[in-house]
């Protein structure tokens, strides 16, 4: 194994150029290099794998034990099936184990490094070096053209190759290098890019919603949240900015402006059965609901929506209304915090123009798109990294 990365010059013979040395790009480079292909990894950043480094609170949620196509958003929801089946979470776990990286399952199948996400970056670099991958970083790409071969002009020289792989990611977190470069290359070669928006991102709320949550910061509510046919059961956290937590991040990828979130505050019970069973009680409505909701939250919710009187004084009609509202409490966001803080970008290169088996552009032989730049977006919990590994592997078998 090489201890020093192989650096490429503009005179180096190259078969495959991969632009973007993140999770997908390095995985593709490893697999292509193993096949004896002469691979060059280009990246505009001097420090590689920054998104890996910051992920999972610095411990990298590198995959999930339960990966299915249903865990991904795309205009073509079946596109990811082939790649995910050919390189699975267990395949990546095997690679992690080979390098002696200790890991644990946190919750819901989410796997994290015991120590540091840097271990994953170092592992990928070692695998690249062992496969003979050459590096050219930092390198800024000025232009990409295709004649008989692809020609890539950079501030480090010009490179020619038979196969060009775009693994430049999305728009999320520009502070660590995200740019629209990959989308521009797709459009230059005639591919369509779908609408782009931030995903796994914090939502913002108007003054009316913020007034409701005033003084409730820190309260966590077990709830199911739904929007546009998507449903997630995770903790809902009240903050000074409104609602946050895993449930909000998950649903944000599905939310569109002007649409309400539906919150089920009683996901484990039949709310109507519960309130009718409590009818003989002298307790105030808020105190009854505090049997399964945090007391302060229950009080505020009742004060905002109903009259806080003894439940025995409430009519059957209104009890049914209370029960219905508990299962379908409507909250409308007014925006998101944007790409600068989003974990992913929803949308990307239209998958109808790519081969699901190889990631190659159907109308541009030798041009491949992998990872987040493609219109495949995973849920929170390691799914986006698995897509990076799987799509990178798929392209790496053929470039």
Give, region by region, the residue ranges found by the protein language model.
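Beta1/beta-strand and adjacent pyrophosphate-binding region of the FAD-binding site
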Residues: 10-24
């Amino acid at each position: 194994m090489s201890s020093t990365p192989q650096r490429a010059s503009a005179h180096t013979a190259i078969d495959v150029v991969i632009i973007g040395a993140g999770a997908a790009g390095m995985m593709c480079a490893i697999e292509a290099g193993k096949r004896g292909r002469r691979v060059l990894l280009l990246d505009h950043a001097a420090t590689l794998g920054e998104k890996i480094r910051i992920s999972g609170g610095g411990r990298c949620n590198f995959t999930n034990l339960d990966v299915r196509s249903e865990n991904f958003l795309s205009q073509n929801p079946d596109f990811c099936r082939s790649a995910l089946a050919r390189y699975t979470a267990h395949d990546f776990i095997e690679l992690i184990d080979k390098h002696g990286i200790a890991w644990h399952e946190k919750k819901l199948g989410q796997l994290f490094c015991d120590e540091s996400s840097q271990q994953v970056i170092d592992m990928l670099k070692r695998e690249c070096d062992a496969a003979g991958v050459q590096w050219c970083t930092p390198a800024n790409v000025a232009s990409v053209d295709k004649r008989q071969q692809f020609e890539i002009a950079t501030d480090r020289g010009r490179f020619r190759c038979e196969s060009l792989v775009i693994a430049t990611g999305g728009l999320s977190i520009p502070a660590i290098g995200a740019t629209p470069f990959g989308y521009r290359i797709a459009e230059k070669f005639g591919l369509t890019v779908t609408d782009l928006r931030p995903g796994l991102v914090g939502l913002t709320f108007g003054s009316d919603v913020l007034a409701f949550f005033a003084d409730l910061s820190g309260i966590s509510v077990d709830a199911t949240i739904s929007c546009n046919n998507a449903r997630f059961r995770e903790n809902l956290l009240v903050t000074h900015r409104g609602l946050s937590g895993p449930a909000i991040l998950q649903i944000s990828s599905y939310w569109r402006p002007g649409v309400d979130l539906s919150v089920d505050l009683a996901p484990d019970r039949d709310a109507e059965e519960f309130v009718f069973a409590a009818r003989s009680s002298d307790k105030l409505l808020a105190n009854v609901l505090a049997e399964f909701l945090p007391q302060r939250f229950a009080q505020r919710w009742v004060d905002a929506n109903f009259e806080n009187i003894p439940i025995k004084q409430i009519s059957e009609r209104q009890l049914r209304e209370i029960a219905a509202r508990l299962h379908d409490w409507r909250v409308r966001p007014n925006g998101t915090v944007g790409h600068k803080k989003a974990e992913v970008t929803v949308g990307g290169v239209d998958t109808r123009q790519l081969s699901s088996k190889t990631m190659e552009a159907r109308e541009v032989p030798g041009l491949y798109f992998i990872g987040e730049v493609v219109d495949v977006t995973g849920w929170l919990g390691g799914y986006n990294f698995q897509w990076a590994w799987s799509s990178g592997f798929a392209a790496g078998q053929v470039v």
